């Protein structure tokens, strides 16, 4: 059996060496060309991968730039709206203050007019009106309840005695 195993081993080696020249072999030039083609293909594949990565990075930068620009525009719009709302609120406050000033000036003018007209009418009407005048009629004689009597120059309507003029010590000469 040993002989058979050794014989088969020698026969295998011998037949391989005898068949090798007859087997189709690769030419050295063809092998070199195939290696060059494989190297070029690998380089092309690597270049394509790098270009793909570069395009992906460029797209990401472009997206981030656009997103940043949109956020900046939105912030600018918000700040502009807030600014103009502040301007409008300020103008409304100024207009309200001017309206209050005009109302105060109108009330002062009414008091002044009532005071000036009441100086000639009220001293003569008051003694005759006496107890016949109710508390609400005084506002008809002197608008807004003011006038010469309301200012305390001649007297004022008394809430305690409900008479005109008031002679209460706290209101005299006020």
UniProtKB/Swiss-Prot annotation:
Native source species: Lonomia obliqua
Record's signal peptide: 1-18
Name the record gives this protein: Cuticle protein 1
Subcellular location: Secreted
Keywords assigned by UniProt, alphabetized: Secreted, Signal
A single Gene Ontology CC term: extracellular region
Keyword Signal: yes
């Amino acid at each position: 059996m040993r002989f058979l195993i050794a014989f088969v081993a020698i026969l295998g080696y011998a037949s391989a060496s005898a068949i090798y020249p007859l087997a189709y072999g690769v030419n050295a030039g063809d092998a070199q060309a195939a290696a060059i083609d494989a190297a070029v293909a690998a380089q092309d594949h690597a270049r394509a991968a790098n270009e793909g990565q570069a395009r992906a990075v460029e797209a990401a930068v472009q997206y981030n730039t656009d997103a940043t620009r949109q956020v900046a525009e939105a912030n600018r719009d918000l700040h502009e709206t807030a600014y103009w709302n502040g301007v409008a609120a300020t103008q409304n406050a100024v207009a309200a203050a001017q309206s209050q000033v005009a109302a105060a000036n109108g009330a002062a003018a009414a008091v002044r007019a009532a005071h000036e007209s009441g100086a000639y009418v009220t001293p003569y009407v008051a003694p005759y009106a006496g107890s016949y005048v109710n508390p609400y009629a005084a506002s008809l004689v002197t608008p807004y309840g003011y006038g010469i009597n309301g200012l305390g120059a001649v007297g004022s309507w008394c809430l305690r005695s409900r008479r005109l003029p008031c002679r209460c010590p706290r209101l005299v000469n006020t």
